[in-house]
Amino acid sequence: MSRYRGPRFKKIRRLGALPGLTSKKPRSASDLRNQSRSGKRSQYRIRLEEKQKLRFHYGLTERQLLRYVRIAGKANGSTGQVLLQLLEMRLDNILFRLGMASTIPGARQLVNHGHILVNGRLVDIPSYRCKPRDIITTKDKQGSRALIQNHMDSSSNAELPKHLTLHSFQYKGVVNQIIDSKWVGLKVNELLIVEYYSRQT
């Protein structure tokens, strides 16, 4: 299953705010209530919608998300929390959380087009897993810096999560530590997502 490229507002009306996909939000709570009036949601549908929130927010294909779930399941600790940490530490998401891109798809384009360095080396893989003490910068070119500046000028003044530091005048971000679960950028019930996949196998 490929990445979603359809109307973004259609997804946030069904699933709620997806800041990684779009800065738009449902116009009112009634947008979400209207979706639920078609009937009582089954437990399967509730789990499915939580999974879809995660997939659309981070811009993943179904296959990619399943791979992350399997990696998280083999790691020490809570599978759901490890899953969120893996997704939050992706390079495209780190750029988004730093405010260097307005959405995760926008961050993915910056990486794909060769504008981003990690520890001084060009990285063109959006799924690159960032680690504590990684330093993320833009290429020292006017075009690259102009793109980042435009994003930073237009980005909402969201509170920067504690695991990141932004030096905006240097177009530089620093990963201080692995993200704590309370700083994850999406309201989602990760346990329902783990349950969804456990019932598919």
From Swiss-Prot:
One of the primary rRNA binding proteins, it binds directly to 16S rRNA where it nucleates assembly of the body of the 30S subunit. It holds the Pfam family S4. Belongs to the universal ribosomal protein uS4 family. This is Small ribosomal subunit protein uS4c. The lineage of its organism: Eukaryota, Viridiplantae, Streptophyta, Embryophyta, Tracheophyta. It is found in: Plastid, Chloroplast. Keywords: Chloroplast, Plastid, Ribonucleoprotein, Ribosomal protein, RNA-binding, rRNA-binding. Residues 16-43 are annotated as: Disordered. Transmembrane segments: none annotated. GO terms for cellular component: chloroplast; small ribosomal subunit. Residues 89-169 form the S4 RNA-binding domain. GO terms for biological process: ribosomal small subunit biogenesis; translation. The keyword Ribosomal protein applies. The keyword Chloroplast applies. It comes from Nymphaea alba.
